[in-house]
Amino acid sequence: CGRVEAPAPLFPVPNARQLAWQQLETYAFVHYGLNTFNDMEWGYGDTPASTFDPADLDCDQWVRTFRAAGMKGVMLTAKHHDGFCLWPSAYTEYSVKNSPWRGGKGDLVRELSDACRRHGLKFGIYLSPWDRNHPEYGREEYVAYFHNQMRELLTGYGPLFEYWFDGANGGDGWYGGADEKRSIDAKTYYGYERARRTINELQPEAVIFGGTCADIRWIGNEEGRAGQTNWSMVKGRGDERLNDFTCGESDGDTWLPGECDVSIRPGWFYHPREDHQLKSLSRLIDIYYESVGRNANLLLNFPVDRSGRIASADSARIMEWRRALDAEFAHDLFAEAQATADNVRGGARRFSAAKAVDGRADSYWATDDGVTAATLSLRFEQPRRVNRILLQEYIPLGQRVGRF
């Protein structure tokens, strides 16, 4: 008999970089910069670069922690809203090159990207479009500066898996001493279509977060919570209704999967007063199930402390989290069960019930066209107590399952 064809795709479907990104599931965010030393979340842009002076910065310590916790990559705030650059940009003096750290010769973006390669983690970059330090922000001259810095980061630090544009845009700031409020139209000012072309050309494997040409979407909150059900589709690029971000749209025409960004502490940057305010183990476990367990990726933030290291309490908590999850998924009971189904596509082995429990992301059980209700049965040699069920859909063909 002839080869049984796979089910037809249900469009939209993910492109290659979106699919690779969704398979990562969890990765770390690092907020670090002048705000760390100012005890602030959003710097005004007027703090001297000399304020940045970590005494014991160790990117290997960060990455070892993330890898041990099961994270697949790291995102770094290369420049936050205050405009201070963690690399020695050729286009501004407001960077690490004018700090005492490493004698003005340091490059934190380089150190972290190199550490990621040494330890086998992917590396991504956050670049704030808003710059409260730059005197030309709000004018065309700043747009050229923004794109020049973007090209520096895209070409100087190896392969990137994600490029992050923050949604905070315009407001009061230092702006080179003007000390005023400036407003822009975020949809048109930055030239995001040009940015997309540049990123796709120089970093073809990187998904884009934010802006007007994104590959992935914000989940609509900073709590680490996706909706039930969370569709990977939206209409167009989505609108401003938070429900569209949190749940997606079942009849969407654009594949735009969700990312849950949340911090292990109350703030994104390090604050000594929050040393005893870490999220509890139970809350972190809930976050995992409410993000990854609801068809979203988890971007978990770690506010590196003033010394340049992940605080010991943060490291201990995330390792508790890892051990707890490993224990919950330690024994795959379905792997020892006999799987049968009342319908298998064309009777073909490649779509058999066994493919649903083989632990592979590239195989799946499928039914004949027109079958909208089918039964998958698992038989054990003896009674088994089940505490978790992990169900996944073969998304290269689109998203069909509305609820479980």
Segments (PLM) and residue ranges:
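Hydrophobic residues in beta-strands and at strand termini
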Residues: 341, 378-382
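Mature catalytic domains of secreted/periplasmic carbohydrate-active enzymes
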Residues: 1-358, 363-370, 390-392, 399
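Short coil-to-beta strand junction motifs in C2/discoidin
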Residues: 397-404
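Extended extracellular/luminal ectodomain segments enriched in beta-structured repeat modules
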Residues: 371-373, 381-390
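Well-ordered beta-strand positions in beta-sheet-rich domains
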Residues: 375-377, 403
